[in-house]
Amino acid sequence: MRTQVGIVGAGPAGLTLARLLEREGIDTVVVEARSRSYIEQRVRAGVLEQGTVDLLDDAGVGQRMRAEGLVHHGIVLQVDGERHRLAMSDLTGGRTIVVYGQQELVKDLVAARLASGLRLRFDTECTDLVDLDTDRPRALLREADGTSSELECDLVIGADGFHGVSRQLVAAGSQVFERDYPFAWLGVLAQVAPSCDELIYARHANGFALHSLRSPTISRLYLQCTPDEDLDAWSDGQIWDELQTRLGVSGWTLAEGPILEKGVTPMRSVVAEPMRHGRLLLAGDAGHIVPPTGAKGLNLAIADVAILAPRIIDFLRRSESSGLDDYSDVALRRVWRAQDFSNEMTLMLHSNPDRFEDKRQQARLRYVVSSEAAQRSIAENYVGLQLA
Ligand code: DHB
């Protein structure tokens, strides 16, 4: 097979990039190691920044997101059992976020690609990327039945996530910056109407808890746990009890329902600099991951491809390579802003085994809920700074 741009990974980054390039008449092939049903079902993030929503709309894949996504104008911060609403839209000149599950967005992008009759290979693993320093890089592929093939390209985009082959190849020649956190999230998806119209980020002596949602009938809830937490040690009843404790305020109870899905989300910050090796460019989690607090991961993936798409087009149409040369620097400025924000939100909201840090972060959270200046800073980062 041959194409102009080979895209490894059919997550939000790879599929959105393919869509942006399709609109400009650039030929792409997307290969994905997993099955279609796997990527369309897996429960991931759910908060889209205004800029992400606008980009998806402009790319012609926003109809269902606009119809079914839930627009939010504020979030709630809970400290010492008291709730404080952070009026995001009022603090940011009217900007909002939209709650819409990542897997719903993936479904929309897959449907759009297939409707355009364009190449998208599921169950096709990229085992290696070779000749990256030549003008004919190749992706070596293996299908589920063991058949091998090759995809020859002008450029390869590594959008195959944190565990993919692209990140490993780039990391070998890049600087990698990392930070581990002494916590993780136990997340559940529950078949019950959300108990509050807005997201609640709660700090409690037992640990952080988050009330989120996916639809008027589905709640998404998280509990701070340890990185090596044994999920099997938690019964559904214990999960609900702990959520009630950490999210509880007087006069309010969390509605409970069947748990549809549960998992443990690790927390790490990782950045590869530069996000490039020859003709391989990284986008999304392949290049960087952030801890989940503040919901920046998916939004960064979309921001990467918004920065990358016009640079690829200039390169392929006019042999103009300066855009590709500065892609990493431009994208990483936003990535580091998000690393700082996600790190700050994570530390401020989680109970910390370091007792000094724990006290300091409690003081910070109390300051935030009492200061409009501090709230404005969180709000503008939360709704998303301008793309690029
Ligand atoms: C969700 C995840 C986040 O990391 C966050 O900060 C808010 C909401 C969610 O999955 O709904």
Residue ranges: model-predicted function:
Residues 295, 310-388:
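C-terminal helical "tail/cap" subdomain of flavin- and related membrane-associated enzymes
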Residues 266-282:
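FAD-binding beta-loop-beta segment adjacent to the flavin cofactor pocket
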Residues 208, 269-271, 287-298:
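Glycine-rich phosphate/pyrophosphate-binding beta-alpha loops
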Residues 111, 118, 124-128, 133-263, ...:
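Conserved FAD-binding catalytic core of PHBH/FMO-like flavoproteins
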Residues 22-43:
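Glycine-rich FAD pyrophosphate-binding loop
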Residues 41-44, 49-116, 339:
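Active-site-adjacent segment of FAD-dependent monooxygenases/related oxidoreductases
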Residues 1-13:
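Beta1/beta-strand and adjacent pyrophosphate-binding region of the FAD-binding site
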